[in-house]
């Protein structure tokens, strides 16, 4: 076996391992939140970024072995941004044999007309895009709308709201749309962004830039993203622990009177969640429980174009 063949075999092994982890993460999220049910028609929102490509790929993979039947239809919204490569997604989806629909709406022109030069356009653009996607879901008969937000997005949103909004609110893996007509799911809710990035690099997805409209990144969100990235580097495993905390909320030990009846605590009340014993010093492991460094972490960084289709 030549050296190149050995490298290729090693890359393929690592890619298979990475895809299995993403598949497991998505499968667990789907099961935990009952995201997909028998007969569902899932509208997969495809932006042309790494997250939505990965979401579509993993859902297609799960579709082949899932114990239930569900269908997928990929939808892209062409907002008529200057320089948008209109041919990329149709060519990619036709090659895959995936049902798809390209929705053409000049939201870019509307935003430019309504928002003064220099002001952020993201809020209005998001509202317009959301309305169009909801309408499209109805037209296609979709029972669920799948978005490509991942675990890091969810954590960033939690800290963004805590730091700047004074709210403990994140981004739920499943919700009812604001018009009350659609169920929105986030199958990548348990997936790490760095895993998605490595997978996208290895699969060589035809990525479409996300800043064609000329908008600047959300500075507050960038601050939070940089902070979490630094924590992940300095304290490995803490990101996993913080995400687990979002799934283990104890209302009686917070301060929201809407979530817990603090006024109702009187002499004779039952002890709730161990009372003040919850604050006694506990043995806390140096490494977060359940977390282990991955032996192939550096190898995964080397995955690029030189791979074959995962079966």
Curated annotation (Swiss-Prot):
Its EC number is 2.8.1.-. It is found in: Cytoplasm. Keywords: 4Fe-4S, ATP-binding, Cytoplasm, Iron, Iron-sulfur, Magnesium, Metal-binding, Nucleotide-binding, RNA-binding, Transferase, tRNA processing, tRNA-binding. GO terms for molecular function: 4 iron, 4 sulfur cluster binding; ATP binding; magnesium ion binding; sulfurtransferase activity; tRNA binding. Pathway: tRNA modification. Its cofactor is Mg(2+); [4Fe-4S] cluster. This is tRNA-cytidine(32) 2-sulfurtransferase. It comes from Escherichia coli O7:K1 (strain IAI39 / ExPEC). The lineage of its organism: Bacteria, Pseudomonadati, Pseudomonadota, Gammaproteobacteria, Enterobacterales. The gene is ttcA.
